[in-house]
Structures are given as structure tokens and as C-alpha cells.
């Protein structure tokens, strides 16, 4: 039980004991039992707020971080706690980082009841938190308890030795060597995506206007992207293509949408779950969470059925290593222990990779000059060939810049909270146990002191080295002082295990889209990132796709 829960219940029992003493030994006897119950409730309702207020004021006054700069305090009770859950996620933290300097590389602000938050604002502090001392911190208990509903008992919800041990089971599957083997499957899935778009264009009525000599249609892009990336997740997890892009296994697609679609009710429940003691939170009824539990049960049953069917086959490797085949070959397979990991891989394909690819396609549509540059690079790289070799996608500097710059501006996770589980330090500054640490990819990725005055603007050139005009190459850090300044995939020992897979799929999908379609925004609507965990565009977000002619004149 959390320390806060224990303190609240202790106050309640002390109040009850005090009333017992008054009635048993001092002769203060109420005329009926209702007065006794009322007295207990009154005692509890008075003592609890007084205790909380006293503790809050004491913690704020005695804070060892009061000398650190941060946003202006709003009030002494809950202060900036709701800025953590703002929408779009991390917007306020990004503004705070850019509005002033932080000489020590640390920002400080208070949250609910005097809880303290430290946000590293430079790469030195980030390296310590994410790499050097990464296991001095854990995801908050309330977050882990809530995320079990989405991911099960998996890498997302695990910590310390269990997390470290299970992370190693992912590495052989998601390392660059295995992803190289999977690349043809990623290209094939990207072509299925394009075929789906083309099928929509085929159904365009005669009255639909033509653009650039090709058919055109407005496409709900987010739904289609999530189908493709969810299929990819199942290929790496189980060696099974769900083929949701072809209209199959839509029951799983609907279940994931039920879990991850963001709405007002879910946001309120998420905030309450993080702020209230667990025993109070459980008393609040929620139809939304009941439907989420049904979706979770459906997904568990579906994954178990697919896993058992795959294990019944004689060959489970499918020409590449999957998470399931790796566990079986290693002799570590345990049905109950790893079912959550399999679900998480598919869920990450649906939510994290799906959101990332959706935003890259949006940036392609919103930056027409960049789209033209990518198309020109692809045309020149093919040298008359029908298609590129698999390893060529990863060597194209403009394509790489298109993907990296889009992911920089739209990281999957805007803000990640950690809690110090032991006394530690950041850049020599003492961090007591229990302090909350805010890792803010959105703010770091858009910090002017790290990326320059145009940090919040789209700029392909920051990722391209043109020192040799005839042979431009990729610039790994985008001009930032350290790789830790680009947090779209995290950094260090707790970084995203699926980075190589995500980059390989996104590059191929963008290249094949640009070769076949011209993409435009339909209106001035901006896809504000939203979501309980990963940041995604709205499910109804749409872009215009128009077929382009093959060849140089399509540019």
C-alpha cells in the first residue's frame, strides 16, 4: 500500500480510537448510534484536511529545491499538478523551458500537496537520469497500476530487476540484424498500405476533381496507419500477419481503439487514478473502464489463441526471429509471464508506431517543399530502377531528415514521469527519495537552447550534412550537442527497444507514399497530439491523397 494511503487510513483509525476513549472512559455517550457515526465522520473530515494542509506547507517551506528556477507558483495546495496533464501533453512544460534560462540545467515546481517535480533541461542531466543512474528511478506506482489495463503485466509496467531481465528478451528480436531480415516484409506491408489508398481513389465519383492528372480523395489517415503498424507488431511478436489492412481481425482493431482512444471521461479517470488513493479510486464507478476491461479480455483471448496455434505448428521461426520463437528457443517460455509482453508488442505497433507514422505523413503534407525534395531524392537514387534495394532506404539523407524532423516535433510521448526510489544525484545536486522527475521529450526536442532559435519550426536541413555539395550525408544529432537532445525514442538503458523497427517501417512507408501519391492537408486543421499514453492525431484526422505520374515530371 502506498505511504499516502497508509497515512490517510491511520488518521481515520486514530479518530475512531479517540472517540472510543471519549465514550468509554470519559462518559461522553451519544444518545443514539447515528451520533457516534456522525462524530467519527466529523472527526475524520476535520483531522484529515488539517493534517494534509500542515504537511503541504511544511514540505514547501523545507524544500531543498527552492533555489532552483521554475514556473511561477499558482497556489500552495495543488500548484502546477494539472499542467502535467495538460492538452496537448507537455505544451506548458515546453513553454517554461523556452521562456527562461536554467543555469543548473534543472527546473523545479510543486504539484499536489507539496509534491516536487524536477525536470532536467540539458543533455548532461538527461544522460544521468536515463543512462548513468536509470535504475534509481521508477515509473510512478499509480501509472503502473493503471497501465496494466492497457498493456498487462509487461515491460511497460515492470521495474528494476524484472524489467531488466525481461528487456533482454526483446533485444535479439528488435536488434538491427533481425530487422534487416524483416525489411522485405515491411516493404510489402507498405505496399499494402498504398494499395488500400488506391482502392479508395478507385471509388472516387466522376464529379471528384482531378489534381496533377491523377485521381484524388480525402482519406482518414490515422485509421489506415494504425492497421498497417498493428500488423507489423503482430509479425514481430508472433510471426502472424493480422492483415487488418485487408479488413481481417477487425475485432482486435476495435478493441485497441476502445483502449487507447482518448476522450474526456478517460482523461478525468486517468487524473483521478494518479491523484487519489487506490482504495478511494476503486469506489468510483466507470462504464468507460468496464468497456475497456472487456476490450482487454478480448485481446488476451485473441493473443492466447494465436500463440497456441503458432506453437502447434512445426516451424515457428518464419524465416526471422519473433518474440515467441526467441522465448521458445531460449527455453525461457512461460505462458502466464510472457502473454503481456506479446500484447505489448502489438499494442506498441498500434499506438506508438501508428501515431509516429501518422505525424510523419502529416508533416509530409504540411511541408510541400520537403515532400518535393524527398521525391527528387528517390527519383535520383533509383537511376531508372523499378524499386530501391532494401538497404538503400536507410542511406538516403533527405528521407532520413524527413522522418527525424517529423519525429522531433511530434514525439510519441510528450512527458514521462519517474520517481526516485532512493537518494541520488543529478549533476551533483542531491535528489531525495520520493522526488518526481519529469522527462519531457516534447520540451527537450523543441528547446531553443539545444536546437537553436528555429527549434519549434520544421527544418530538414538540420539533419543533412552538405559540406560536400555533391554528396550530402546524414547528420546523426541534427546539430544538437548530444544524442540525448532527441528523445523521441528515449535514450540510454531505458530507450525504446523497437526503434530500429519503427525507423525501418516509417522510412519505407514514406518513400513509397511519395513515389505514388501527392499528399496535402485538406484544411488548416492542426492535428493536436492527444492520448493517455502515446500522443496521436485524432482518429478522424484526414489528408488528401492524389495519384502522381511516374517519373521525373511527377516532382
PLM regions: where:
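C-terminal helix/juxtamembrane-tail motif
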Residues: 1-4, 536-555
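N-terminal membrane-proximal hinge/A-helix region immediately C-terminal to the signal-anchor transmembrane segment
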Residues: 2-165, 187-192, 243, 295-298, ...
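Conserved cytochrome P450 K-helix E-x-x-R motif and the immediately C-terminal K′/meander segment
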Residues: 82-98, 305, 386-427, 550, ...
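Cytochrome P450 I-helix active-site segment
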Residues: 183-187, 209-215, 251-260, 317-324, ...
Amino acid at each position: 500500500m502506498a505511504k499516502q494511503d497508509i497515512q490517510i487510513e491511520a488518521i481515520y483509525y486514530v479518530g475512531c480510537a479517540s472517540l472510543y476513549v471519549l465514550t468509554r472512559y470519559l462518559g461522553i455517550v451519544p444518545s443514539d448510534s447515528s451520533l457516534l457515526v456522525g462524530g467519527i465522520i466529523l472527526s475524520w473530515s476535520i483531522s484529515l484536511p488539517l493534517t494534509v494542509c500542515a504537511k503541504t506547507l511544511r514540505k514547501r517551506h523545507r524544500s531543498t529545491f527552492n533555489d532552483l528556477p521554475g514556473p511561477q507558483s499558482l497556489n500552495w495546495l495543488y500548484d502546477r499538478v494539472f499542467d502535467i496533464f495538460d492538452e496537448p501533453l507537455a505544451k506548458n512544460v515546453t513553454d517554461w523551458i523556452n521562456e527562461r534560462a536554467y543555469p543548473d540545467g534543472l527546473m523545479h515546481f510543486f504539484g499536489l500537496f507539496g509534491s516536487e517535480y524536477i525536470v532536467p533541461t540539458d543533455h548532461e542531466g538527461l544522460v544521468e537520469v536515463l543512462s548513468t543512474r536509470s535504475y534509481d528511478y521508477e515509473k510512478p506506482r499509480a501509472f503502473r497500476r493503471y497501465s496494466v489495463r492497457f498493456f498487462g503485466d509487461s515491460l511497460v509496467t515492470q521495474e528494476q530487476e524484472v524489467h531488466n531481465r525481461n528487456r533482454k528478451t526483446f533485444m535479439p528480436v528488435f536488434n538491427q540484424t533481425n530487422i534487416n531480415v524483416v525489411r522485405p516484409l515491411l516493404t510489402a506491408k507498405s505496399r499494402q498500405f498504398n494499395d488500400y489508398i488506391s482502392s479508395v481513389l478507385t471509388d472516387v465519383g466522376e464529379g471528384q476533381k482531378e489534381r496533377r492528372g491523377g485521381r484524388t480523395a480525402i482519406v482518414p489517415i490515422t485509421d489506415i496507419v494504425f492497421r498497417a503498424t498493428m500488423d507489423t507488431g503482430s509479425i514481430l511478436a508472433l510471426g502472424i500477419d493480422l492483415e487488418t489492412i485487408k479488413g481481417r481481425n477487425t475485432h482486435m482493431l476495435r478493441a485497441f481503439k476502445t483502449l487507447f482512444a482518448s476522450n474526456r471521461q478517460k482523461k478525468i479517470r486517468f487524473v483521478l487514478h494518479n491523484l487519489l488513493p487506490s482504495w478511494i479510486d476503486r469506489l468510483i464507478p466507470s462504464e468507460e473502464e468496464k468497456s475497456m476491461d472487456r476490450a482487454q479480455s478480448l485481446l488476451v483471448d485473441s493473443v492466447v489463441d494465436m500463440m497456441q496455434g503458432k506453437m502447434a505448428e512445426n516451424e515457428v521461426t518464419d524465416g526471422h526471429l519473433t518474440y515467441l520463437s526467441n522465448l521458445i528457443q531460449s527455453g525461457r517460455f512461460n505462458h502466464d509471464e510472457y502473454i503481456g509482453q506479446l500484447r505489448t508488442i502489438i499494442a506498441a505497433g498500434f499506438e506508438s508506431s501508428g501515431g509516429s507514422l501518422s505525424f510523419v505523413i502529416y508533416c509530409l503534407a504540411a511541408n510541400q517543399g520537403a515532400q518535393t525534395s524527398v521525391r527528387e531524392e528517390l527519383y535520383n537514387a533509383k537511376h531508372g530502377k523499378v524499386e530501391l534495394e532494401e538497404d538503400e532506404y536507410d542511406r538516403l539523407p533527405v528521407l532520413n531528415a524527413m522522418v527525424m524532423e517529423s519525429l522531433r516535433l511530434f514525439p510519441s510521448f510528450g512527458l514521462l514521469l519517474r520517481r526516485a526510489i532512493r537518494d541520488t544525484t543529478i549533476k551533483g545536486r542531491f535528489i531525495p527519495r520520493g522526488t518526481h522527475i519529469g522527462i519531457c521529450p516534447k520540451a527537450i526536442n523543441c528547446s531553443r537552447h539545444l536546437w537553436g532559435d528555429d527549434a519549434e519550426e520544421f527544418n530538414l536541413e538540420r539533419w543533412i550534412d552538405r559540406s560536400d555539395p555533391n554528396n550530402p550525408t546524414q547528420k546523426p544529432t541534427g546539430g544538437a550537442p548530444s544524442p540525448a537532445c532527441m528523445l523521441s525514442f528515449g535514450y540510454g538503458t531505458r530507450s525504446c527497444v523497437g526503434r530500429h523497427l519503427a525507423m525501418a517501417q516509417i522510412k519505407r512507408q514514406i518513400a513509397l507514399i511519395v513515389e505514388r501519391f501527392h499528399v496535402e492537408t485538406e484544411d488548416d486543421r492542426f492535428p493536436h497530439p492527444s492520448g493517455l499514453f502515446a500522443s496521436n492525431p485524432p482518429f478522424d484526422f484526414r489528408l488528401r491523397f492524389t495519384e502522381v505520374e511516374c517519373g521525373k515530371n511527377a516532382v
